[in-house]
Regions:
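Long, positively charged, glycine-interspersed low-complexity recognition regions
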Residues: 298-347
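Compositionally biased, intrinsically disordered low-complexity segments
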Residues: 36, 236, 346-347
Length: 347
């Protein structure tokens, strides 16, 4: 399932924890596809704590607690990391990450916690959702087969790679427009992992975020830039990205486009992607300006300049995701919509 749809599912499952209809959710996916980040987004959106427990680093006693003698009986000291309404609040997410990397004895300790929301005398507070994530056995990580009793305690979702969802996230998180444009140009490089070769650096949603950091730190150090890009996404993708960035000095004048001047779209496909991504970035930065509607209108007008109408559709679709439904109120939007004829704006 694509990340945008998973966000909706997880939102509903979190809300279900408030009314007793919650089902624990297990997210499956290769390394770096964004499983943990999807959970973090749910926490941010609802302004709730996310307790992230890495089960691969646990022993059974870490979950069950430590016994201690109390006069003529034995009590259990409940681990402080587990959700507690007084310490952590009445609502939140208990996230069991790397669950498929946990040794079987730890998985067994988690059975009751996940299904019954109990572990010995401990109870997960009402209002807390339980989510988990892990890699698949074919991903060359340290993984164990999930026991059937544990698997049957979850609803299961595979995390798909979806470029449009990643692009929407990238604009919201200030990923450099050149990286967004490059992945629009080479979408197959958003995720390129071959378990058979087990590379140490490879393209993934997570490693492209690292690449953005490298670009910010080393763009003014050309001797180091290529090596740092390759260190994040691997030798081949790093070389391609560096060549793409080097070609951006041939881009048309973006300021002139924003001013509404008649500027031709570049003929080169890679530059077209670069221009489209850069204009969406400009629109985001101008969203709260007094002349935002005018800027949006000039970008919409420029969307008609592309020889391939699909390129204009992509630009306006990304623009809509970035600035919201206010775009429909810009007079130039209806003019652009009429110009694309039988091509529909895609979601």
């Amino acid at each position: 399932m694509r990340p945008a749809h998973l966000n909706t599912v997880l939102d509903e499952e979190f809300l279900g924890a408030q009314n007793g209809s919650h089902t624990p959710v297990m997210l499956w996916g290769a390394p770096g596809v964004g499983k943990s980040q999807i959970i973090a987004q749910i926490g941010d959106r609802h302004d709730i704590p996310v307790i992230d427990i890495r089960l691969s680093q646990m022993e059974p006693s870490d979950l069950r607690g430590i016994p201690f003698r109390d006069h003529d009986k034995v009590e259990w000291a409940i681990p402080a990391m587990l959700p507690n309404a007084e310490r952590h609040g009445n609502k939140g997410i208990l996230f069991l990450d790397e669950i498929t990397s946990a040794v079987p004895s730890v998985s067994a300790a988690a059975y009751q916690l996940i299904l019954d929301r109990k572990l010995g005398e401990y109870e997960v507070p009402n209002g807390w959702a339980i989510f988990a994530a892990g890699n698949r056995q074919g991903d060359r990580g340290v993984t164990y087969a999930m026991p059937s009793p544990l698997a049957n305690r979850f609803s299961h979702y595979d995390v798909d790679i979806h470029l449009d969802d990643w692009v929407a996230w990238a604009y919201q998180n200030n990923i450099h427009e050149s990286i967004i444009a490059f992945l629009r140009f080479r979408p197959e490089l958003l995720f390129d992992f071959d378990p058979a070769h087990n590379p140490v650096a490879f393209p993934s949603p997570r490693s492209w975020e690292f690449t953005n950091r490298a670009l910010q730190k080393f763009s003014d150090k050309p001797v180091l830039l290529l090596g740092t890009l390759q260190a994040c996404v691997g030798p081949s993708a790093g070389i391609e990205l560096k060549a793409f960035i080097d070609s951006l000095d041939q881009m048309p004048d973006l300021d002139a486009i924003i001013r509404g001047e008649d500027i031709k779209a570049p003929k080169e496909i890679d530059l077209q992607y670069a221009v489209a991504s850069a204009l969406v970035g400009r629109a985001i930065r101008a969203k709260n300006d007094d002349n935002a509607e005018e800027i949006f209108g000039h970008i919409l007008s420029y969307a008609k300049a592309f020889r391939q109408k699909e390129m204009g559709v992509m630009l306006v679709s990304d623009l809509l995701r970035a600035v919201g439904d206010d775009l429909f109120n810009v007079p130039a939007f209806s003019q652009w919509a009429e110009s694309i004829g039988d091509i529909l704006l895609y979601d």
